Structures are given as C-alpha cells and as structure tokens.
Amino acid sequence: MIPGEYRISTGNIAINTGRETCTIVVENHGDRPVQVGSHYHFYEVNPALRFDRQAARGFRLNIPAGTAVRFEPGQKREVELVRVAGAQRIFGFRGEVMGSLEADND
C-alpha cells in the first residue's frame, strides 16, 4: 500500500440506511459560493442560502462523511437531508440551537 492510497471495494456503499430523510430546494442568493460540509446542521448554514429552514431543523446533508456540497451564486438545487443521529442535541455551528432539538422550535 502506498501512503495516502485508498482501497475501495467495488459496488455501492449504503449510508444512513433506515434514517429519516427529507428533500429541500436551496438557492444561493449571495454573491459568493457557499460550501456546506457533510455534518453541518443545515438549519444553521449561511443566511445567503434560502430554503425552508424549519424543515431542515435537526437535519444534515445526506452525503458521505468528509464531503461537501457547493452552492454557486444564483444556483438553485435540490438536496437530500438526513436526521441528525444520537441524543438530538446540537451545540456550536452558528449558536442557534445550543441544546435539545425538542426545545423551543423558534
């Protein structure tokens, strides 16, 4: 094996099987690209991205870990989100939740 080399099996790898998902349409109203990582709480992404934020509360992008989706200025696209796993508590990001997702949904 060469350092940094990947050995990937053939075929597809199922991720987030059986988890709740939703699909939303996102549009970048900003003048710069916005990139969102795989585990970022989508509800709290850059305000230049316009979409139904309440629908995204408690969800992240349904993409492989360590990857990201880039939204170019003016671009509109549909993305699939997956429910955050675990205790349903979110801290950090933009500081808009800072605790349980079950608490006040405003």
UniProtKB/Swiss-Prot annotation:
It is found in: Cytoplasm. It catalyses: urea + 2 H2O + H(+) = hydrogencarbonate + 2 NH4(+). InterPro entries: Urease_beta-like (IPR002019), Urease_betasu_sf (IPR036461), Urease_subunit (IPR050069). GO terms for cellular component: urease complex. Its EC number is 3.5.1.5. One of its GO terms (molecular function) is urease activity. Its main location: cytoplasm. Pathway: Nitrogen metabolism; urea degradation; CO(2) and NH(3) from urea (urease route): step 1/1. Keywords: Cytoplasm, Hydrolase. One of its GO terms (biological process) is urea catabolic process. It is an enzyme of class 3 (hydrolase). The keyword Protein biosynthesis does not apply. SUPFAM superfamilies: Urease, beta-subunit. Belongs to the urease beta subunit family. Heterotrimer of UreA (gamma), UreB (beta) and UreC (alpha) subunits. Three heterotrimers associate to form the active enzyme. PANTHER family: UREASE. This is Urease subunit beta.
